[in-house]
């Protein structure tokens, strides 16, 4: 019966667990690819042999980490597990569609890995720009397999988004208004709306690329009246909301973790937090061309995209200062999730500041496609999204499993990881300012020192990842039972114990909503 339970599951907790395991596995693959990248760049000269294989590894690293690690863990894992529990819903709105959303991902990952294994692989970068992604520069099936992989991952995400939106709107208790749902639920809702609106545009772009490659159309070929810049507009209209999709659930997680370990019953400025996330979601759709400052846009177009991009810093600042205000006056408990959350707040802010630098179109002309950009988005992803995932995972691990992690090991893991990621990515700001371009497998000797330091940092991060695997093994091996949790009134997910029973809220939940002052 076990294989039936896991293959045909319609239970949000089981599907959430599948997502978490799949995401962890993909995370290992993505980490391995990143170690190969840093090994190649650890000294001048070549290690892997040629630029194509290097670019295939870079492309696969990006796709695996985005579509098969961060999104499945944050939206599929945490979303499935927590949204029904926080709402008091018996399950997701469409349980079988939920199962399909998950099972589209392994074939998608298989297609992506297959694309690297046939012909010369897809060495296009994750943006898959034509003409490099066209059938002259990339003959063979590699790019086509990548496109099919993205189609499957996209369908999976769209179905998941529909499911979450329906669940959050329709499956609340009758007396609960939208403004009484927890911030994590809000973050998943806004993320789902972004997915629903942006992914079809990506699907259109890569389908046109597919027909350009195979059916002799010329959407992106100037010889037939097309324009490669059209592809960039379509891709980034998806690509920019996508980066907010990656971080928004993290915002929700951090709000919960900070409030919990500061001993507060709610985060500071609930409504401000909600509206800030909505503002970020909306603004995320009208800034896409800041990725294209170097393609030759009008000065007034550049001025608009610079200003609009800077505006996003305002709601982001609202969130950062609200987290700090939540800490204020609290009885702070220095458990591991709190360390991850504080690391998130600091490092995400650093990444945000370099984002403000890059939003200036005139500066971006110089910094575009240099390691400054790599440093920027790895600060918000490798230290934003990943730190949020770690904060949430360590915080809710007793809920998911009924066991507790070893606090000492978990703190050591945080310290090693913190050192590793900063050592890896901080020097890349210097490389970028010195003009080292991205996506090259070799570099002039002048860049050697910072690259060596960056590669040492990646090895430290690898040790941290391996230590985390050990910590997980230790927890399941020692089987320390989780006993009690604090603040049950405002943290509904813990209500049924650790772990909760297979079915929760089989009868509608009673929710007291008239909070007396």
Swiss-Prot record:
Pfam families attached to this UniProt entry: COX1
Cofactor note (record): Binds 2 heme A groups non-covalently per subunit.
GO molecular function terms noted in the UniProt entry: cytochrome-c oxidase activity; heme binding; metal ion binding
Binding site for Cu cation: 240, 290-291
Entry binding sites for O2: 244
Residues that coordinate or bind Fe(II)-heme a: 61, 378
Residue spans, topological domain Mitochondrial matrix: 1-11, 87-94, 171-182, 262-269, 328-335, 401-406, 479-517
Cysteine disulfide partners in this protein: none
Gene Ontology terms: cellular component: mitochondrial inner membrane; respiratory chain complex IV
Membrane topology: Multi-pass membrane protein
Record's catalysed reaction(s): 4 Fe(II)-[cytochrome c] + O2 + 8 H(+)(in) = 4 Fe(III)-[cytochrome c] + 2 H2O + 4 H(+)(out)
Pathway: Energy metabolism; oxidative phosphorylation
Keyword Electron transport appears in the UniProt entry: yes
Residue positions binding Na(+): 40, 45, 441
Cofactor(s) needed by this chain: heme; Cu cation
InterPro entries: Cyt_c_oxase-like_su1_dom, Cyt_c_oxase-like_su1_sf, Cyt_C_Oxase_1, Cyt_c_Oxase_su1_BS, Cyt_c_oxase_su1_dom
Localization per Swiss-Prot or TrEMBL: Mitochondrion inner membrane
Oligomer status and interactors: Component of the cytochrome c oxidase (complex IV, CIV), a multisubunit enzyme composed of 14 subunits. The complex is composed of a catalytic core of 3 subunits MT-CO1, MT-CO2 and MT-CO3, encoded in the mitochondrial DNA, and 11 supernumerary subunits COX4I, COX5A, COX5B, COX6A, COX6B, COX6C, COX7A, COX7B, COX7C, COX8 and NDUFA4, which are encoded in the nuclear genome.
PANTHER family: CYTOCHROME C OXIDASE SUBUNIT 1 (PTHR10422:SF18)
Family to which the UniProt record says this protein belongs: Belongs to the heme-copper respiratory oxidase family.
Protein name per its UniProtKB record: Cytochrome c oxidase subunit 1
Natural source organism: Petromyzon marinus
Lineage of producing organism: Eukaryota, Metazoa, Chordata, Craniata, Vertebrata
């Amino acid at each position: 019966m076990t294989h039936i339970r896991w293959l045909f599951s319609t239970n949000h907790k089981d599907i959430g667990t599948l997502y978490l395991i799949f995401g962890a596995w993909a995370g290992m693959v993505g980490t391995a690819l990143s170690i190969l990248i840093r090994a190649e760049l650890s000294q001048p000269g070549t290690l892997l042999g040629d630029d194509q294989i290097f670019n295939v590894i870079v492309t696969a690293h990006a796709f695996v980490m985005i579509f098969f690690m961060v999104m499945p863990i944050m939206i599929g894992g945490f979303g499935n597990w927590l949204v029904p529990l926080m709402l008091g819903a018996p399950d997701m709105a469409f349980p079988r569609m939920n199962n399909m959303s998950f099972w589209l991902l392994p074939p998608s990952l298989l297609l992506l890995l297959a694309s690297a294994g046939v012909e010369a692989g897809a060495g296009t970068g994750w943006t898959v720009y034509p003409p490099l992604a066209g059938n002259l520069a990339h003959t063979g099936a590699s790019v086509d397999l990548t496109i099919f992989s993205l189609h499957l991952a996209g369908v999976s995400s769209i179905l998941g988004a529909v499911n979450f939106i329906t669940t959050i709107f329709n499956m609340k208790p009758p007396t609960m208004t939208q403004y009484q749902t927890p911030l994590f639920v809000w973050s998943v809702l806004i993320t789902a709306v972004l997915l629903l609106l942006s992914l079809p545009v990506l699907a259109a772009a890569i389908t046109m690329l597919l027909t350009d490659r195979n059916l002799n159309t010329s959407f992106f070929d100037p010889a037939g009246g097309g324009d490669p810049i059209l592809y960039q507009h379509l891709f980034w209209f998806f690509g920019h909301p996508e980066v907010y999709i990656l971080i928004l659930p993290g915002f929700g997680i951090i709000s919960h973790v900070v409030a919990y370990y500061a001993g507060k019953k709610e985060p500071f400025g609930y409504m401000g937090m909600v509206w800030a996330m909505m503002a970020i979601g909306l603004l995320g759709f009208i800034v896409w061309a800041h990725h294209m400052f170097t393609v030759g846009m009008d000065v007034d177009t550049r001025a608009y995209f610079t200003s609009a991009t800077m505006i996003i810093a305002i709601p982001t600042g609202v969130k950062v200062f609200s987290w700090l205000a939540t800490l204020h006056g609290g009885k702070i408990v220095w458990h591991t999730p709190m360390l991850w959350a504080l690391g998130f707040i600091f490092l995400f802010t650093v990444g945000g500041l370099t984002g403000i630098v890059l939003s200036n179109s005139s500066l971006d002309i110089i910094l575009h496609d240099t390691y400054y950009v790599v440093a920027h988005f790895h600060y918000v992803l490798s230290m934003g999204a990943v730190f949020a995932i770690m904060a949430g995972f360590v915080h809710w691990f007793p809920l998911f499993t009924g066991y507790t992690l070893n606090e000492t090991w978990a703190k050591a893991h945080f310290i090693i990881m913190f050192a590793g990621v900063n050592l890896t990515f901080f020097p890349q700001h210097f490389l970028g300012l010195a003009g080292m371009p991205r996506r090259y497998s070799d570099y002039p000797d002048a860049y050697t020192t910072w690259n060596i330091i960056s590669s040492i940092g990646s090895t430290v991060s690898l040790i941290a990842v391996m230590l985390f695997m050990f910590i997980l093994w230790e927890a399941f091996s020692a089987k320390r039972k989780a006993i009690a949790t604090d603040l049950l009134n405002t943290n509904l997910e813990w209500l049924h114990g650790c772990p909760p029973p297979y079915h929760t809220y089989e009868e509608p939940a009673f929710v007291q909503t008239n909070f007396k002052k």
